[in-house]
């Protein structure tokens, strides 16, 4: 594949120098910014993540800062999640939908104050959507992209590494909660979260100038922990059932189709509520399922049709071989008629038809 041409439109990150020194082998573009995809190999990176600790440049998870007297009003309008239950130190997974109930993004919200939230984005320009709603409604709120770049520390030794840099207080942070902890005299939001199921943290680095000092401090502190540079790993992600916006779900899908119905609990009249009413009552006609694909498969770069008796009954959005489980793991959007565990069908890959079986759930 051709390389990515350097441009101001494709932004480097505060950690890019460290990523390059660590020998990054591949990038993708995410929110107009570089996101590393592989260092050694997908398989080796995955095995290391599951045993040791990695530092991930996920600065591409850009923040939308929503601040002002009407910040909560806007948050309640753009997401079906009940925001009134959010604690002061909490992070919330907040699907955002359009007027038809289609997914626009699935960010993590960080509550900084009663009138100030960050939305940590998946791949999509949600800032413009929020700004447009705020202007149209005349809300008293400021919406900007702040100089905040997340750095993730993931893996079973993440607590040990983080404690060496931020102190033992990190061990007390609960899942999807955060503390403000000091680094070089600057308090940073440190949350127990991340795009893996290996455990770890995301550090919201305020100020690009702190990027490399923090990167270097983590590597200096973790030499005996076998710390390495890493990145979200597609094998571990699919095994874990972590959905990728743009791959496993798009604006053509609703939260209910994505298995996110439990996050549609707002009593407010949010954008898209009327459109989602039927699915809220009766459930969706299709939904995300874990799948096993037989045979050898190529890289999944496009949606692969799922077929049964010559009729399309869904599609595969992500698929890859799992060395740990010895099968091709996949995430698919499957029609109700064929989503029961054990149901067999076929998938049309670029290399031909392959057998597919629906699983009870994901691998972890």
UniProtKB/Swiss-Prot annotation:
Superkingdom per UniProt: Bacteria
Record flagged with keyword Signal: no
Recorded GO MF terms: methyltransferase activity
Enzymatic reactions: S,S-dimethyl-beta-propiothetin + (6S)-5,6,7,8-tetrahydrofolate = 3-(methylsulfanyl)propanoate + (6S)-5-methyl-5,6,7,8-tetrahydrofolate + H(+)
GO biological process, one term: methylation
EC number annotated for this UniProt entry: 2.1.1.269
pH dependence statement: Optimum pH is 7.0-8.0.
Family: Belongs to the GcvT family. DmdA subfamily.
Other comments on record: DMSP is used as an intracellular osmolyte, predator deterrent and antioxidant.
Purpose: Involved in the assimilation of dimethylsulphoniopropionate (DMSP), an important compound in the fixation of carbon in marine phytoplankton, by mediating demethylation of dimethylsulfoniopropionate (DMSP) to methyl-mercaptopropionate (MMPA). The intracellular concentration of DMSP is estimated to be 70 mM.
Protein name per the record: Dimethylsulfoniopropionate demethylase DmdA
The organism of origin for this protein: Ruegeria pomeroyi (strain ATCC 700808 / DSM 15171 / DSS-3)
Gene: dmdA
């Amino acid at each position: 594949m051709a390389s990515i041409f350097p441009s101001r439109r494709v932004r480097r990150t505060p950690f890019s120098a460290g990523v390059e020194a660590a020998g990054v082998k591949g990038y993708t573009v995410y929110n107009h910014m570089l996101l590393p995809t592989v260092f050694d190999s997908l398989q080796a990176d995955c095995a290391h993540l599951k045993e040791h600790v990695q530092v991930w440049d996920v600065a591409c998870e850009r923040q939308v800062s929503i601040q002002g007297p009407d910040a909560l009003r806007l948050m309640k309008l753009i997401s079906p999640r009940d925001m009134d239950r959010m604690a002061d130190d909490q992070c919330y997974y907040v699907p955002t939908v359009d007027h038809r109930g289609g997914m626009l993004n699935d960010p993590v919200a960080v509550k900084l104050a009663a009138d100030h939230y960050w939305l940590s984005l998946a791949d999509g320009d949600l800032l413009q959507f929020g700004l447009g709603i705020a202007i149209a409604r005349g809300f008293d709120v400021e919406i900007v992209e702040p100089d905040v770049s997340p750095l993730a520390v993931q893996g079973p030794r993440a607590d040990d590494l983080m404690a060496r840099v931020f102190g033992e207080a990190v061990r007390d942070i609960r899942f999807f909660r955060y503390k403000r902890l000091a680094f070089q005299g600057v308090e940073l939001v440190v949350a127990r979260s991340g795009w893996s199921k290996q455990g770890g943290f995301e550090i919201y680095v305020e100020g690009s100038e702190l990027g490399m000092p923090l990167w270097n401090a983590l590597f200096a502190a973790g030499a005996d922990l076998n710390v390495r540079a890493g990145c979200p790993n597609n094998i571990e992600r699919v095994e874990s059932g972590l959905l990728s916006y743009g791959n496993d779900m798009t604006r053509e899908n609703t939260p209910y189709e994505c298995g996110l119905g439990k996050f549609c609990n707002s009593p407010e009249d949010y954008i898209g509520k009327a459109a989602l009413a039927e699915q809220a009552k009766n459930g969706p006609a299709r939904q995300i399922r874990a799948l096993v694909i037989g045979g050898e498969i190529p890289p999944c770069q496009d949606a692969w049709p799922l077929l049964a008796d010559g009729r399309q009954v869904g599609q595969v959005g992500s698929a890859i071989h799992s060395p740990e489980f010895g099968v091709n793991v996949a995430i698919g959007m499957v029609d109700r008629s064929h989503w029961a565990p054990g149901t067999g069908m076929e998938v049309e890959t670029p290399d031909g038809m392959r057998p597919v079986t629906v699983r009870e759930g994901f691998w972890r």
